[in-house]
C-alpha cells in the first residue's frame, strides 16, 4: 500500500531535478 508521504516524496524526487534543470536552462539562455 502506498502512503501519502511516499507519493509526496516521489513527486519531490521527480520535480526537483526538473526545476533545477529549468532554472539552469534559463540562466544559460540569458
Swiss-Prot record:
Keyword terms of this UniProt record: Chloroplast, Membrane, Photosynthesis, Photosystem I, Plastid, Thylakoid, Transmembrane, Transmembrane helix
HAMAP family reported in the protein's UniProt record: PSI_PsaM (MF_00828)
Endpoints of the signal sequence: none
Superkingdom of origin: Eukaryota
Family: Belongs to the PsaM family.
Protein name: Photosystem I reaction center subunit XII
Transmembrane segments: 7-27
A biological process term (GO) from this entry: photosynthesis
SUPFAM superfamilies tied to this protein: Subunit XII of photosystem I reaction centre, PsaM
Principal cellular location given in the protein's record: plastid
Subcellular locations according to the entry: Plastid, Chloroplast thylakoid membrane
Organism: Cyanidium caldarium
GO cellular component terms, semicolon-separated: chloroplast thylakoid membrane; photosystem I
Encoding gene, per UniProt annotation: psaM
Xref: InterPro entries: PSI_PsaM, PSI_PsaM_sf
A Pfam family hit: PsaM
Membrane topology (UniProt): Single-pass membrane protein
UniProt KW Membrane keyword: yes
Amino acid at each position: 500500500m502506498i502512503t501519502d508521504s511516499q507519493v509526496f516524496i516521489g513527486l519531490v524526487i521527480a520535480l526537483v531535478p526538473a526545476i533545477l534543470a529549468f532554472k539552469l536552462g534559463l540562466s544559460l539562455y540569458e
